[in-house]
């Protein structure tokens, strides 16, 4: 880690959580197959933890849960030890990355889209987000046993993209965690 485009990792097909990653692999294989067999122009983007206005706040992703908690004036609950790290990319940066790949990328190739400079632990993200809105007087609570029976813990302790390949096309993300999440949370507060 950081994860390059040619690194596929190990997946246990008997693990319930593997269906998500396996379905993405299958879709990429189909796209590349159609490109090679039929000449269908295909470029693949692999987004890493993209957030921003319009994202679903109830899909179970940790950052969506945190944003929903802040919007609804709830303390942030972490259902783990909070040490897992993720690299978060603001939607405006990701969108520019997608268009960069579309316009400049090579057919049949995959490109990681993410912000390698915004890797942060779940616990630190929660604290940074509540510190963006100190007037709300929120706190972070570590809840080592999830209350939700449907909650599935991730066994991925670190997830960060290697973005040199798309960088060679001229793209780099520019939005910090503080700026991106402030914009995101304010957009929901102003929308509601």
Regions found by a protein language model. Give the residues of each.
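Catalytic helix-loop patch of NAD(P)-dependent Rossmann-fold dehydrogenases
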Residues: 1-44, 49, 56-59
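C-terminal substrate-binding subdomain of Rossmann-fold SDR/epimerase-dehydratase oxidoreductases
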Residues: 4, 70-192
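Glycine-rich "substrate-gating" loop/helix at the edge of Rossmann-like oxidoreductase active sites
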Residues: 16-20, 48-60, 80-92, 115-118
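A general structural signal for well-ordered alpha-helical segments in protein cores
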Residues: 28, 63-64, 122, 126
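Histidine kinase transmitter module recognition
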Residues: 34-37, 54, 69, 169-173
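Positions that flank functional sites
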Residues: 50, 63, 181
